[in-house]
Amino acid sequence: SKNISNLSGRIGLKKNLFEKISERSLNSKDASGIKEIANEYHMGVSTIHGAESFYEFLRPAHRAKKAFVCNGSACMCSGTQEPLKKKLKEKLGDDKVGEMFCLGHCYENKAFHYDGENYAGNDIDKIDEIIKGDKIEQEKFFSKSFASTSFLMDDKLSNLDQFKDILSKFINTDKQEIIKSLLDSNLTGRGGAGFPAGMKWDFCGKAKSEKKYVICNADEGDSGAFSDRYLLEDQPLKVLFGMIICGYVIGSDEGVLYIRGEYPKSIEAINGAINSLKEEGLLGENILGTSFSFDLNICIGQGAYICGEETALIASIEGRRAEVDVRPPFPVTEGLYKKPTVVNNVETLAAATGILINGADKFSAIGNKKSAGTKLVCFDSFFNNPGVYEVEMGTPMKKVLNDIG
């Protein structure tokens, strides 16, 4: 795998190997395309085919379907999916309806995917309009903060003018001062492992390498979770700001968001935000007249749940089979293309932004030293108040479930 990483890294993130494999598989039935990719990267055809065959969305059986019913736990438990599947089969044919795992519409159920878009709730009643290609009005998830200070749902970074002012401040701030803020805040990774975010950035910053990377793990695959969807679609500037500042701190000039293919609106929102930042000179070469340059790319996942694990995600971007690597070495010393890499999930990056804007002391004052700050929680349609909410760490589950949910 090290050879594949190095060969893939020679071309890098722009039109990366995984993207090329995906495009060939989704847009062409001609097997000669695999040979062309293999030749370009000096790899064997079997290596490229092995990577391609790993992903559900790239398999011929999947590509032959027209619609996909969500089989995430919230939708399955709701009892809505069998009648939904029956109706889709009546419209499209028995062999044209497949399944996808959690489309992030747990708050309304009856979720399905058709022609690159997700639908849920009462959308199935407009299936004829959807098939014709008409745009329909869709339900939006409800969101609210119950925190004394909101770090994830406030509007302090909701437009490009705010973004420019805050970015100008922090890319002219001492890097160690930013790391100290994160360490003082007691922010731990929101992806599950709970590793101190400031420590991860510090380790990567101290690693010796001419090239480093920032990765946003947006492959939110846990059924019932749609908090990343909220941040990517409603707070994209918070997430991107976190990536840019991380790049500044560790000495990286390039980052990538790995967003699951089941979230088309998230991909659209992030693409739009990146393009807007580039147009304003807030991404790219010599940002705001400084010596700091940073660019962002998007990788679209192709239906592999394991890619939520950081080493499998790195393998995927490199064009390898998305299998978990043994650690150590950890990504901060040997990550993407064997270069030092920070991998943070969506909520961690957004929280880092909130800390820099609001202050580390306010964040650390919430919860305790092991679990400080605020956290997003999701309620599915079985709750009286389905949606995504920001709560303070240390809030009793009884209050979260009974009073908020």
Regions found by a protein language model. Give the residues of each.
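Feature of Fe-S/electron-transfer and energy-metabolism proteins
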Residues: S1-G405
